Amino acid sequence: SVGGKTAIDLPGGKNLVGAFKQPVAVLCDLDTLDTLPKMFLADGMGEVIKYGMIRDEKLFELLEQHNLENVSSAMDEIVPTCIDIKRDVVEQDEFDTGERMILNFGHTLGHAVESYYHYETYTHGSAVAAGMCMMTEKTCTPELYVRLCDCVKAYDLPTEVPASLSELVPLCGNDKKRASAALRFIVCETIGKAEIRSMPFDEFAVWMGGDA
C-alpha cells in the first residue's frame, strides 16, 4: 500500500508485529469501487473522513456535501486527495516515529472497539469512525463534535458503541502507539489539523473516564 507498512495481528491487539517494505507500484482502479456492497464502501469512508479531519478541511467539506448514496460521483477527487495526504505524511516520517502517527486518528479507541467485540461486530472503518467521534467528544468543542458525527452518520457509520469507555480504555494499553508507561494518541481540535499527545496510561484512563 501507499506507505509500505505490513503487519500481523496478535491475540493482544492489531498490527503489533510489522515491517516496512515500500511497494514497486500502487494501482488504483476506481471502477472496482462500483462492485462493492454498500457496507464495504462505508467501511472505507471511515478512513476517508479521517484524512479530512487530520489534514484537509476542504476534503472534509466535500464529504459533508455527499453521503453514502452519492459519494461515488466524487471519488475522482477523493481518492487522489487521500493518497496525496498519506504520501506527504509518510515522506516526512517513513518509519512511524513522529508525524506519521497522525494517520492513527481514531485508531486508539477504534482498535479497542475491535478487540472488545472480538473483531466480529465492527469493521475496521466503522470502529475507527466511532473512535474518532469518542475522542473528539473529549477533546473538542461541541460544535466540532456534532459536525464530525453528522458526517460520520451520512456514511452509515457509528458515532459510538454500546461498550462503555471504562470497558474500552483498558484495551488501549495494547495499542502500538504506547511507549512504555505512556500512551500516545491523536486529537483534532480543528478540522484539518491533527496533534499528537502523550500522557501516562493511568492518567489517560482517568481523563477518558475509564478505570486505570
Model-derived features with residue positions:
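C-terminal charged capping/lid subdomain of soluble metabolic enzymes
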Residues: 40, 46-48, 144-212
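A glycine/threonine-rich phosphate-anchoring loop and its flanking beta-alpha core
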Residues: 1-66
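Anionic group-transfer/hydrolysis microenvironments
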Residues: 31, 106, 192
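Active-site segments that bind and position negatively charged phosphate/pyrophosphate groups
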Residues: 61-166
